[in-house]
Amino acid sequence: MNVIYASDDGYAWLMGVSMVSLFENNRECKEINVYLFGDKISKENEEKLYQAAKQYDRNLEIIDVNKLKLPEKLYSGRYPKSAFSRLFAFDLLPQDIDRVLYLDCDIIVDGNIEELYNHKMDNKIIWAVKDCVSKAYKQKIGIKGDDVYINTGVMMMNLDKMRKFPMEERITEFVDHYAGVMDYADQEIINGIFQGEFGILPPQWNVMTQFNQYSYSQLKWIRHPHHYYSAEEIEYAKRHARMFHYTTCMLNVRPWFGNSRLNNAHVFNRYLRISPWKGVAKKNMNFSAGKYKTMRALALLPEPITNFCLGMLHAYLKPYYSIIKQKISK
């Protein structure tokens, strides 16, 4: 099994906890090779990462992404180089690797994942779980409302097919057109340039924060997802989660902060306690004053009104503002 992560030094310890959860739940897997596309990883974190891999008798290789030549359009002070490195996994990894599992650093593996790794690729470039976004959110980056928008936190990647894809050309075209409206640049680039090349996984392979913090009806109100999973599929995923994805979601605080109140934070803490970072002191997360006041004010309203306002903001006002802004700038 070949697995990749991408991280700068700030997230290296979270990647390490994720890696420990991967090893802990896949002990019977004959071989696991982890490749970290690292950006200026400190000596201290490097040593701890290698220590964790050695403890489980697994292989870890840290690849310096600063040696990677990215398309000029991707050079930006807003995003670390590691954020885009997964787009070039086919170039950074040994050429005899034909498939790889990509995991975000905020993923916790809570079960055996060999079934996922051995999933048939069926000539798709990427297999992933659908993200919970509206039709307007897709349209702002040129995706038709009925087309798929994936969450890129967990991806089975077909490297053989990626090697034949005109990556630099398609990235340059996409960024030229949509740079001004992208909120999550690497995820939106992947969704934009690989449309029609996705295979869809059941949601238990990427159980995101919103699954556990909101009911299905609340999710529908807040996100207005289009062509999404059924309530039954989401409920099954919550009961049979193989991976938890601690995504940002409204005012929910992620579990590596001291003031987290997530109802599944204990899963993260379980693996933190058996990792080389078990002594890390958790800091409290501080929200920007404007966002905090707005969200607190919304929270004081009756729940249906709060959900309606959040839904209008996330599913319509924000993406349509981006679309109008883009048209004006042309």
Language-model features and meaning:
Residues 73-82, 141-145, 215-220:
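Short, surface-exposed amphipathic charged segments that create phosphate/polyanion-binding patches used
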Residues 32-40, 128-129:
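Short internal beta-strands
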Residues 2-5, 22, 33-36:
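Hydrophobic targeting segments
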